[in-house]
Design a protein with these regions (language model features):
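Short, low-complexity N-terminal intrinsically disordered segments enriched in polar/charged residues
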Residues: 23-55, 72
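Sec-dependent bacterial lipoprotein signal peptides
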Residues: 1-22
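Surface-exposed, charged secondary-structure patches
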Residues: 77-120
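Solvent-exposed loop/turn segments at secondary-structure junctions
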Residues: 59-61, 109-110, 146-147
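Residues that act as N-cap/strand-start positions at coil-to-secondary-structure junctions
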Residues: 36, 86-88, 124
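Hydrophobic/anchoring residues in structured secondary elements
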Residues: 49, 94, 142-144
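Short beta-strand edge/turn micro-motifs at domain boundaries
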Residues: 26, 102, 120-149
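Short solvent-exposed beta->alpha transition segments
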Residues: 53-90, 96
Length: 149
């Protein structure tokens, strides 16, 4: 009797694990993309331009034709002008399609000398495009505009 209960328990446990793991495998690309976005966010706040640029594709295109090199210069300029940079992301909407994704979010960017309050702040609506290449997500394009326009 006890072995029958143990067998049922084991079958039930295996079934739960299979369902849980199958849910994880479907969400894995989205989880990796969200982790990549979070790593970029952390790198920007830590003023690590190289780390922030790691997922940016060589063929990146941003606002008004900004390329990857221009994006790097834009980050450098912001870091030269602001001792402290803050990034606060709003809800992140991820839409996956095969090996590409579109990610939309609101970002509050702050900058200043590092004292109690930032000297400048701006909220942006951001739409980004991503490509999955060799298991890594690459940022291929980004559009941003000040919120409320």
């Amino acid at each position: 009797m006890q072995s029958s209960i143990q067998a049922r328990w084991q079958v039930g446990l295996v079934a739960v694990l299979v369902v849980a793991l199958s849910g994880c495998t479907r969400a894995a690309p989205e989880q990796r993309l969200r982790a990549t976005l979070e790593a970029m966010h952390q790198a920007i706040e830590a003023r690590e331009i190289g780390e922030a640029m790691t997922p940016v594709a060589d063929d990146f295109v941003g606002e008004q034709g900004l390329d990857a090199a221009g994006l790097r210069r834009l980050m450098q300029l912001q870091m030269l002008g602001n001792r402290r940079i803050g990034v606060t992301l709003g809800p992140v909407d991820v839409q996956l399609r095969d090996d590409t994704a579109r990610v939309r979010f609101t970002a509050l960017l702050t900058g200043g000398s590092g004292r109690w309050l930032p000297e400048q702040a701006q909220t942006y609506q951001v739409t980004t495009g991503w490509r999955l290449q060799d298991g890594n997500w690459q940022l291929t394009h980004a559009l941003w505009e000040p919120a409320g326009r």
